[in-house]
Each structure stands twice: as C-alpha cells, then as structure tokens.
Amino acid sequence: METKVHLPLAYQQQVFNELIEEDGLCVIAPGLSLLQIAANVLSYFAVPGSLLLLVGANVDDIELIQHEMESHLEKKLITVNTETMSVDKREKSYLEGGIFAITSRILVMDLLTKIIPTEKITGIVLLHADRVVSTGTVAFIMRLYRETNKTGFIKAFSDDPEQFLMGINALSHCLRCLFLRHVFIYPRFHVVVAESLEKSPANVVELNVNLSDSQKTIQSCLLTCIESTMRELRRLNSAYLDMEDWNIESALHRSFDVIVRRQLDSVWHRVSPKTKQLVGDLSTLKFLLSALVCYDCVSFLKLLDTLVLSVNVSSYPSNAQPSPWLMLDAANKMIRVARDRVYKESEGPNMDAIPILEEQPKWSVLQDVLNEVCHETMLADTDAETSNNSIMIMCADERTCLQLRDYLSTVTYDNKDSLKNMNSKLVDYFQWREQYRKMSKSIKKPEPSKEREASNTTSRKGVPPSKRRRVRGGNNATSRTTSDNTDANDSFSRDLRLEKILLSHLSKRYEPEVGNDAFEVIDDFNSIYIYSYNGERDELVLNNLRPRYVIMFDSDPNFIRRVEVYKATYPKRSLRVYFMYYGGSIEEQKYLFSVRREKDSFSRLIKERSNMAIVLTADSERFESQESKFLRNVNTRIAGGGQLSITNEKPRVIVDLREFRSSLPSILHGNNFSVIPCQLLVGDYILSPKICVERKSIRDLIQSLSNGRLYSQCEAMTEYYEIPVLLIEFEQHQSFTSPPFSDLSSEIGKNDVQSKLVLLTLSFPNLRIVWSSSAYVTSIIFQDLKAMEQEPDPASAASIGLEAGQDSTNTYNQAPLDLLMGLPYITMKNYRNVFYGGVKDIQEASETSERKWSELIGPEAGRRLYSFFRKQLKDYE
C-alpha cells in the first residue's frame, strides 16, 4: 500500500526522510512547518493494524495536524480524553489501532494499568520535546514504553532551540530521557532551507517609522529606570545572582525577569523585601516598554496613573516602601511627558487645558499603505485561482487588533487627526479619575492622634540616626517617599480641576456626525482582515485567506518565515509584505535581539552536537548483576524484633489518579517503586495497610486550610488508617522554609497558616506531619516509611470510604467533581451519595428537587443547597 506524502518543499522532504530512517530529535527553526512534517511522519507509519501515539500536543496542535491529515493525507486522528472516551472504550480503540492524540497524564495511567498494550505500540511522535525533564510525565512514559517495547520508534520535535541551552548538557539530558541518539538540526540558515525559501521570495517593503519626540523621551526614561533597578539588584544580591551578562540588551530578553527570579528562588527566604520588590519592578518596567509602542496615549497615561496611585504609603505595610524607580527624576519626567501627550495646560493667568491626543505614528503610515493598496487594487487584474484582493493586517495581540479596528472605522481621508475614538477614551479616562477621587474621599481617614503618631514615627524612626542627613535650619530630613506621594496626590487633584474645561473642548471639537467620510477602504473592500499572531495557526490562515497584501503592524520573525514558506509553496500567488517597525526603538532592538539570539542558539547547538558523547539507550537492567539485584531487594532495616525480608517484587505504592499531575509518581518509579494508579477516596498515596499519605504543595495547603477541605481529609484518614500522614512538599528549586514568626504581626490571628496547622494537630493527635524539600526527598522518605511494613492491596485501598453497594471501579471526571465539591454543604462524606445517587451532571444537580437533596445529603443541608441554587445573582432590596 503506497503512503501519501504532502511535503512540497525540499527541506521538508529531507527532514521527513531523515526521521523515517532513524529515530531522533528534530530541532527546527520556528515557522518552518513543524506540524506539517509531524503529520506526514504519522501518516507514513499509519498502516492497517498499527498503533501510533501523538504525545505533547496542545489543542491547537491537534486541530492543525488533524486538518492536515484529513485535507491532504486522507488519514484520521483520534483524540483521547476522559470526557469522550471511557476506560473500556479506550481499551477497545487501542486494540483496533489507529493514530491517537493523547494527553500524557491519561497515557501514563493507561500504561501502568495495562489498558494499552505496550508491546503493540508501533511508535510515539512527541511534540515540544524542549519541555521534557527527567521528573516529568513524558520521561515517565518513555521509561514505561522502553521497558517492554524495544522495537517501537520515537520521533521527537521541537522549535525552541534556546531551551536546549538552559543548564548543563541540556541536549544530552533530553536525549537520555527520550532514549534517542540522533539530533537533526534545521535552522533558517541551513543550506537546504535557504535554497527552498529563496527560490520564490515575496516582495517585502520595509517601513521605518519614527517615534514621536514624546515617545523617545518616555523610552529613554524607562531605560534609565530599568538600568537603575538592575544596578540596585546587582548591589544587593551579588552573592546570589550571575551578573556576567547583565546589561540593557539582556533585559530585552522575553524571559529576563523570569530568569532573575529563578536564580533567586532557592534563597528567596533570605533576600530582603526590597529585592523582591525590585524583581517585580523589572516585570512592570518591561511591560511599560511594550505598552509604549502598543497602547494609545490615553491608555498609556491611565496605566501610569494606576501605578502612581497604587503606591499610596498608607496602603503599604509599615516595613514596605514604594517602588524605588518611581522616586527617580526619570519617572517624574516620564509621567509629565505622558500627560502632555494627552492634554496640556495652557500658559497664562487663566487656567485652561487643551486636548492633544497624540496618535501613534504607525497609524498614519498604516492609512497611507491602505490608500496605496486601495488604488493599486482598483487598477490591477486579479486571478481568483492564485490570490485575491484581501488585505491581511497582523498585530502582536488582540488589544492592538481592537485598537486598529476602532481607528480604521473612524479616521477619514480629509482629516487624519480626527481620532473620534480617542475622544471617547479620554472621556472614559476622566470618569475613571472621578471615580478614584470619590473613592478616596469615602475612605475613612485616620484619627488625629494616630495620624500624629504615625507622622512622628515617620520623621523620627523612619531613618536610623547614623543615616540621617543634616539640612538647613537644623530640622530633620523628611522622607522622600511621603513628600513625593503628597506631590503626586496634589498633582492628581490639580489635574482633576481641568476636567470640565477639557470636556467642554472635546464636545466642541468632536461633535457627533453622520456621514460617509469614514475610512472608505473598509466599505469598498470588505476583505480587510486583522489578526493577532497565533503561532502555527497562522499558516492555516494564510492558506485559507490567500491574501495579496500582508501588513505586519508589529514585528515577528516567526511569522516572516511562515510567509516565506507560504510563498515558496505557492510561487504563482502574488504577495506583497509591508514590514512596519519603529526605527531606533526598543521594538527594533527586541526584533534584532531575538533573531541574533536564535542564530547563536542554533550555532551553539550544532557545536554541542558535534562534541556530545554518544548516548547509550540500552536498558540499564541488562548490566545489573544478580548479586546487586539481590542486595537491593533485601530489607536491612531490622528493628523491634522484625525479621529479615527478601523479596523479588518492587516496593508497591498506590497512587491516586489526580496525583499524576505532579512529578512524584515519576520519581517513585525511577527509584524502583511499583506505582499503581487507583481511584482513591481517602488519601493520595497508600504506602501500607496502615499508612495513608495526603500530599499538599504550599499553594494547595493554604487553599485546603482556608476552605476546610484538609480538615475533612484528615478526618477521613484518621477514621480508616492507623497512621495518617500529612506531607507538605516544597518545590525543588525554591526555598525550603515557611515565613518566620518574626515577619508576622505581634498578634497571630486565627486565619494564619501556622495557627491553622496548630489547630489541625490538636484536633487530630495521631496525624503525622512530614516536611519535604522536594519530590526527590519525598521518595527517600517513602522508602523509610515503608520499612518493615506490608505491601498495600489496591482493591482494599480503592474500597475504603465507599458505602455498601458502591462500586470502586467507577471513575470520576475531575472537572465536574471539583465543581461539585465546591458547592456549599457538599462535604467529603456526602459527595459520594450524590455520585451514586443518580445525579449525572451539574445541570441535573441544579434541577434536583429539595426532597431528593434531603435524601442524599440530609434534610438541613439539602434544604440550604436547594435554596442556594435558586438564589438571585443580584441582591434586590
């Protein structure tokens, strides 16, 4: 049977042939049709009776691969999820064969429970291989797969080369996790790729747009603030941070603030509050840089006002201070210039204000381009089979799309400055300021005695004696924070007085009109499409739309490659690309930085591949001697009159299905535990007939203590198990500590986490609390806890907590179950009555009668829950 392949370009065919011949990892530049190649690989091996698995694909990936298969390859992709396919249906489908797109969590459970015949799997195609870690679910799947299937293939794909350079030997580590030896690297500068894309290049017109003078000033001020923040971080944390490559250019990296936070995670409990504030300020300043070229002048001013007004000292704790960058002269200058872009106060004795409403420079350039395209399209003949007159405008995000739609629907040919949509935004801005003013007045002011005391505290205790500076007149230096905040509030109040004057100007300047002067291109050509960049989906949009003109309002190197692939695939289609960017701006620097960084990443990746040691993918157990296996299985922890135990079986741990979202089951399996997935009603991990463990991350612990769920879980564990254990697990690379009592207030309240944990131990004296710094440490703790204990029975563990007549083989859909558990008067004890009482879904639960609710959860709880479902959303008086 001949297999159909749809790969029109030479580099696509070369990648396909290499992956067909050898298992390996393909690292390809983003925008070069990765999903199309993956779909053809799946189609090639999809012979009758084969079982192929697509792993690591998100919803968009599955949809695009399915479209490629159905439209060009005549194959079908089956999506596996718990909502559409039950366990029995999945088992039957696996036996029939086919191509299955399956989530890693479902696949690992099906492999452990033998629902899927591992030895019959033809192969696995993995997407986003750069996300694979040794403790993750994908690495767990590959270990289970290779334990019993030595002949099935593994093909992995990735379009993010930078991730393989994070850490030491990240590429070889990924290959080891995937049991692969070969790496196929295809950057944009690859000879075959370059030849394929340059045979039929698109007509590209670069439009270098100049920033306005006010935007240049604001950009310079923001860079000064970023530099000051980085310098302060370097000064405070030289022992913790790797600052070798720190400069303004490195701050342009899309994940720079995340990298800084990741370096500080392990010592986060030791750094000062000021350091934590500076890390957050980096994210804020980076966002302001992007907003400067994306937001209109009114929205940008509102964003700045929000930041300034949020630093009211009275809203901060006594030991906290506003962001340091807001105290800089550059920040004050930036705020003043941003306000001048919107309106200016006229000179003279009479207070007056003039609305400016500066438009973004790209807007007028976009209008000129559309005018040019409009006239050119009217005169040109179009072949409907090759292209049409549609115009495709690409933006960075949906906000910019909405902004352009508003602009194009209001601007006119005769008056480019007639931005009527800016009028409404300015009115909304003033209304927002008025609401803030009213809210500030409604807040209760502190009593005079407390206010005086606070003032004295600020002036006398705000600065240590050794740090006080002398000022003229012998007075103590006042805090700059207080004065700056007062000046900001005074300035805000002064600007509010100009509101009525500005509104009167606006009403005279922009009177509502009804006419046909609105941008006529939209009326004459209803084929102007405005989209935001959406990854691989942009290829599908280009193929379906077949535009004649593409206007890149915001720069994106990945989309440029997709346009190159589209033009090379269809060389007869007419295509012109307008590439707009702000010359000399951060936008241009970010674009050039991303292109240069990707090229450097591929170059380093090629060098690492040439120097990389050969990865051995053989089964490690083959080289393990019988003596070492014997010694490993001998339990040497003999105490309390115990006997020496020798077993050929691995230690067994029963794991709740929901726990497979975490990395602990994978680590347990890697440490020679036999992991058995099971639907547990009590506990998360069953170590023995006596020991039940409830695992909580820090975030889950806080939520469970707040809503009372942890109390119910401990109550259930205490009822059914002799040794209930609460495991509090921290992240591996984060600080292993809880907030010290010295950071708490003088009077610890009942809602503090420490107080709730104390109350929990008082309520359940038999409860054991185990603190673990990471999942690796948890695995070692489990080994110690299981010493001299019997192995648990899965059937018994699954039946614990069930009422008489209830079946333990039934499974839940987690999303509606979590919603059910969130309803009032539904507890850990009575929710099973709802599940087994004939309530099929949440809709039926909302329509259930009061009488039935009383039968399921009790008279009082049933009456209140019935009333809750019928409570009005709005509180009518």
UniProtKB/Swiss-Prot annotation:
Subcellular locations according to the entry: Nucleus; Cytoplasm, Cytoskeleton, Microtubule organizing center, Spindle pole body
Main location per the UniProt record: nucleus
Enzyme Commission numbers on file: 3.1.-.-
Composition skew (Polar residues), residue ranges: 475-490
Domain of life of the source: Eukaryota
GO molecular function, one term: damaged DNA binding
Keywords associated with the record: Cytoplasm, Cytoskeleton, DNA damage, DNA repair, DNA-binding, Endonuclease, Hydrolase, Nuclease, Nucleus, Phosphoprotein
Subunit relationships: Heterodimer composed of rad16 and swi10.
Family: Belongs to the XPF family.
The protein's name: DNA repair protein rad16
